[in-house]
Amino acid sequence: MSLRNSTTAKRFHSHKTWAGTFWSRPSLYFQPASIEELQAIVTRARDLGKTIMVVGSAHSPSDLTMTSQWLVNLDKLSKAVSFKPHTSGLYTDVTVEAGIRIHQLNEVLKRKGLAMQNLGSISDQSVAGIISTGTHGSSAYHGLVSQQIVSLTIMIASGELLTCSPDENPTLFRAALLSLGKLGIIVYATLRTVPAYTIHSTQHVITFETLIREWDNLWTASEYIRVWWFPYAERCILWRASKSELPLSAPRPSWYGTWLGRLFYETLLWVSVRLWPSLTPSVERFIFSRQYGMEDTLGSGTGSEAVQGSVEGLNMDCLFSQFVNEWGMPLDNGPDVLRALRAKIEAAAKDNIYYVHSPVEVRCSNMSVPDSGDRNVEPNTQEFSASRRGAITGNTLRPLLDINPRDRPYASPHGHVTNSNLTLYINATMYRPFGVNSPVGKWYRDFEGIVAEAGGKPHWAKNFLGPETAELKDNESEDGKMLGLKPIIDEWYGDDLKQWKSLREKYDPTGVFLSGKVWMDRNGLL
């Protein structure tokens, strides 16, 4: 077929990230509606020497998906294919076309009385996207969202479909669980889902000192947990949740969840970014007091409670366009890291060097894996029945490019989990009020220096700078520019990186999926 004249092809398409941080103009844009159409696109690209970039919601705020060649969006490959309930009734394996967005999948599962076991902060991404970028939620009893994946079907550069799982092509499976879209195109995914559930959450205002003092006791007390730190308010929000059979409640009131509150907040941010940077601490303190109040509510019985469906409880409002820079490190290092970040933030504000936005998001995951190589084809349903919390895993294999610490001792999601088993994620968000860039370079340089020293690695899909940040020029055009991980990546990933590169070359020898080659090169992935 002639792709240029095909209804799947579009010229003059402008592609940008959800946050508006980057944009590009691909020569052709495709939205295939069938596997056969997608195969034709891939084989034609190979024959013509073109490269393909695959994109879903474009929620990665980095230039990871920018291309001047062919861009393929999988939104029309969004069908649920099959449902396979386990005899125990504890889980159902669901196969879907991988272009389906998570919010669409949530609705499909809801109609079947099912739910995903764990979610990230949003549900806008595609299934292929959350797998390919290493998306995670926040729980001591769950790992990456891809921990729910039982098997994948990938279209490689020849147009052939390959199935991989813990039992079939397990090394390809490990590479595909965090592929960055460079091995091929995930067309089908089988996910391990569970009966629909509600979660009962409590939310408290705590001081920074309380967070540090209670660190050892916080992270494993509930199935789900997240902390938002507001440095200028010297307060944190502690949110914890567990599965519940209580009746649904009204959602929590939100001051900046209203149209007027949201507009007012974004306007104040715009003023502080464009006109009056030193106003930022006052803005952040004011907004915190309006949204949450300043009183420490932990232990006083005055915190808020809510019972919500799993999706509504685990997702959150990310507010405005933003830069995000998130790193994962051993959770035990958290108190020292946060103290060091606080000192940098306070010193920078005192000397009018830079100002940060809130919240700094603090989360955790259990990405420990068994040393035995147990591939967990059949999860231990008896363990889950006894604990009633944690993941019924689709696999227990570590992605080759997983950012989580390799030295965490293994703890079953249904067993005795301690802080030493866990990864800490710290996410530094900087808003772009009304599309205006906030200066991020100096803050992100300080941030990365501290988290890297603590054994951290950056989330692949976010706005990390890389270890050469000292070479950044202090001018607007270079502010926040990604220099990449090339100087350090071999040390960080070693044999796993070699294996990932070898598989990439094996299944894509002509480089069909090497679109965005500059990004790949600066991060040492070529």
From Swiss-Prot:
InterPro entries, sorted: ALO_C, FAD-bd_PCMH, FAD-bd_PCMH-like_sf, FAD-bd_PCMH_sub1, FAD-bd_PCMH_sub2, FAD_lactone_oxidase-like, Oxid_FAD_bind_N, Sugar_lactone_oxidase
Molecular function (Gene Ontology), one example: FAD binding
EC number: 1.1.3.37
Key word rRNA processing present: no
Reaction(s) catalysed by this chain's protein: D-arabinono-1,4-lactone + O2 = dehydro-D-arabinono-1,4-lactone + H2O2 + H(+)
Keywords assigned by UniProt, alphabetized: FAD, Flavoprotein, Membrane, Mitochondrion, Oxidoreductase
Record carries keyword Repeat: no
Pathway per the UniProt entry: Cofactor biosynthesis; D-erythroascorbate biosynthesis; dehydro-D-arabinono-1,4-lactone from D-arabinose: step 2/2
Subcellular location per the Swiss-Prot or TrEMBL entry: Mitochondrion membrane
One Pfam family of this chain: FAD_binding_4
Modified residues (Pros-8alpha-FAD histidine): H59
Any single biological process term in GO: cellular response to oxidative stress
Family: Belongs to the oxygen-dependent FAD-linked oxidoreductase family.
NCBIfam families linked: FAD_lactone_ox
Protein name, per record: D-arabinono-1,4-lactone oxidase
UniProt source species: Yarrowia lipolytica (strain CLIB 122 / E 150)
